[in-house]
């Protein structure tokens, strides 16, 4: 064996600590927070691989500590391992800066309150200082990492795809949001390629911080909580969704908005997340268990009970009193949402399968399936209630419970397709004892189904009957006594016996199989297996009808709308088989993948259509054939009704032949029938104008009186007007002598031209919008409300393009350099906007400037472009006006000066008398003496 070189050891250990861009940002932000920073700016270039800069206003690094500030295992946080029991800082290992130095080029600029100026240090791969120089930055520390992973080409290649780079940006934004919520008084700005991705200002408390991150609409559905356990010294606080909240705001398909903090440290704790999600889904989301609640949980425990030195990124911790924390959290959830309907404590959920809720729907977390549910007359497999911890029985239905009572029970039998759910529930309500007798496989689906046709049906716990007479068709009426006996024996069954799988028996004495793969029967060749919604009519089709190919045209080009307008009747156009398949599966696909665009979702579902078997495609081809027949019949009916209406007027009835020919004849007939009326109206107007007589009116007129009045008016005009008169220049480029009726003054023509240029740019200049690498999604949380989004939705838009996207064409947006795309959703309320292009000629131009434009439109009722220019654009246009005015010739002719004065008079009047710098156009010299 040989000892590895020191440089190799540093590189290997550093690549384990710094694994991505987000890990660099996390380490540097934690150092900033440990230094007491209240403002943090994070700037990235090329997704952080070219440059990462984190600037704060913390205490700074002392000059005596600078030589070892980036050396590994040098830290000011702790002195020995015993200090970990009282740890109050984020960092403690002293590895972050040293590890970053090994895989990037690092510059550190720092200044303390005692320093007169800041100092910039250039570090080498070992953390030693190569050079230093003074800097202009204020108090705090700025760490810049250049060329990340410069000596790890494989690691850099891993992030070469655009998707992985965008995922890193998303992770960094989520990290900054976590710290922004945890530290309400912390100001955060996140910039990528000079474009502001996300920012948060200082706020007063956690509620305002959550509102700035999640939005007002989400916080209106949240409620605060506090819980304190003196015995275990556990303190819980935060915000949870209300029981009656709008779950479209408080639920997500991913846990990215489930914030958990332990001792002010953002962590990932699966057990805590699972417990909260379990309570939330059972009490608030009975129709789905796949969603994650939006919540903020802050857990404070003694520092000695937490081990944070578990993973390199410190995102996971070990709790010494984990069970106490879970019990306290369960008590809190019970207080907020009430007790669970099936279990008494969280521990019962972890013991064995018998103590878990058996959920057999498309939204279940398990893959357990009931099998052998047939329609051949056999009853449902008998299950002993002694091993199922449910206290509900089937007698609840006898007391007049309606179908909604089924939703409170814990056994769910699939999703009933095409309206069978309601019929089956009604049968259960009427005949309790025969509830499971007539349920067939055609009424139960175990896979993902159509959202509009599916509903999860919950049925109460199943009784066990083992009658000696072998009756398999009915449940024994003496089930109550057997149930009591079964409950007494429930304590005798252990988890070990249950795991052997021989506890539950069916009516013939066979073991119940919890999982079984269902294979389609050969006698049903037309059965559709994609969504498992067999239609009864399809079950009786023979092989000839199944193999018969439809002549429906799948792809149609040139569609403008989905409807035809014929004879004042709106007729929906027929859809192809693939279009019907996309229409059925797109809502569920978008629910499971909310971040996928509508175009990408359609493409992925179309690819899924290509992989379907012929039997699965046959279902949609038959639907398409029926839809085409419906379309043709509606077309014929509409034309026949129109023909009958025309027959009453004495016109010949049109004999219907085909839908297309009749539509063409109808259009031709309509146009010809209106032509005589138009000719008659036009001819009558011409004849009317010809027949009108010219009226003659005599007015007394005198040329002498006209001349007298003209002279009087001319004299009055000369007295009222005080027109300036241009005399001559004074051999200076910016000094022209002018006089008015009362004074002599100097004119600076360049200032006037500067103001004229600025006014023209303000009204007409259009900033070019450059495409963004990553479009910015416009949400309510970004604008702190929905009022700004409502203004955008009301703006004009251009014609719809092939991609299905519409671009806002309002000049108040386009002239200010914003290209905003409106992407339609499943419904009108689910449309969303994103900034696809933005002007890059202004630094730090972004969403804040768009908000300034919308604020002018909303509050000042700005109609024109010049009324809603952001301050950055105004400053930019002022600079452009100055630049253009300085390009004018040094000496202007008298005609040019007169033209400038003329334009100044007609464009400004008496309103504007200064240039963009606030300097006047005219300089007063002297007043002229009055003449008598």
Swiss-Prot record:
DNA-binding region, as residue ranges, is located at 571-639
GO cellular component annotations of the record: MutLalpha complex; nucleus
On the tree of life, the source organism's domain of life is Eukaryota
- DNA damage is among the record's keywords: yes
Where does it localize? Nucleus
Give the Gene Ontology MF terms in alphabetical order. ATP binding; ATP hydrolysis activity; ATP-dependent DNA damage sensor activity; DNA binding; enzyme binding; mismatched DNA binding
Q: Per the similarity annotation, which family is this? A: Belongs to the DNA mismatch repair MutL/HexB family.
PANTHER family xref list: DNA MISMATCH REPAIR PROTEIN MLH, PMS, MUTL, PMS1 PROTEIN HOMOLOG 1
Q: NCBIfam families, per this entry?
A: mutl (TIGR00585)
Quaternary structure, from the entry: Component of the DNA mismatch repair (MMR) complex composed at least of MSH2, MSH3, MSH6, PMS1 and MLH1. The MutL-beta complex is a heterodimer of PMS1 and MLH1. Interacts with MCM9.
- Functional note: Probably involved in the repair of mismatches in DNA.
Name recorded for this polypeptide = PMS1 protein homolog 1
Species classification: Eukaryota, Metazoa, Chordata, Craniata, Vertebrata
